[in-house]
Amino acid sequence: MKKITLMLAIIATALMAQGQVKQIKPSHIYKMPANTSKSLEVLIEENSIYEDLYGGQCSWYCGGVIDTVLASSSLAPSKKFDYKGANAHDFDHESVWAEGAPGQGIGEYLVYYFPGSCPRVTTVKVLNGHVKNPKVWKENSRVKQLKVYYNDVPIAILDLQDSRTLQCFEVGTLGYHDSNASQWTLKFEIMDVYPGTKYQDTVISELYFDGIDVH
């Protein structure tokens, strides 16, 4: 009887968690320039994405830190490039995470590990697809929906536009900002994609964060 009661409680908890999953559209969208051949200094001056990635201004990362980023799979490296999960959080828009599963990567994911003392996260920022230039962006698949898990519990589905842009999502306040707290995680699972014109590989150039507790 106790086993049945426990099983019913687990099922009820899972159903409650699923019911709390919210669908989120981007709150802000910043367009990538078509011409990326300009010097980095000029790009930083002219475009908010480059200023955000390379400008060096104070941000959540003044105190925020990620322990590690792991991917469920990654495309095999070529002679010039690799496609590991950590590339999605290296603040380099030309390096990417490309999943390595058969097909278009539905169900593949990234997991970010945060120390308990890390400032809390409120915003997820995504450079969707291979944004290096318009040609490779179209050729490779892009994410249409990402499911977000906080400590393995699903909390949100991010609805990404099919555009070569930086898309920002307000996800609520996540984390502890407590030196006595344990490590916590955010997982991002590919639920749906926009197919590429040439390759099935689904690509994320950058996935990083903004938040509170740093000023």
Task: Report residues per predicted region.
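Sec-dependent N-terminal signal peptides
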Residues: 4-13
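Disordered, acidic Ser/Thr/Pro-rich linker "stalks" and the adjacent N-terminal cap
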Residues: 20-113, 213-215
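Extended extracellular/luminal ectodomain segments enriched in beta-structured repeat modules
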Residues: 105-107, 116-125, 183
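Positively charged n-region of N-terminal signal peptides that target proteins for export
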Residues: 1-4, 20
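First exposed extracellular module after export/assembly in secreted or surface-exposed proteins
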Residues: 22, 86, 115, 122-126, ...
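Trp- and acidic/polar-enriched beta-sheet ligand-binding modules for extracellular glycan
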Residues: 20-40, 45-46, 104-107, 130-215
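Sec/Tat signal peptide C-region and signal peptidase I cleavage site
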Residues: 15-19
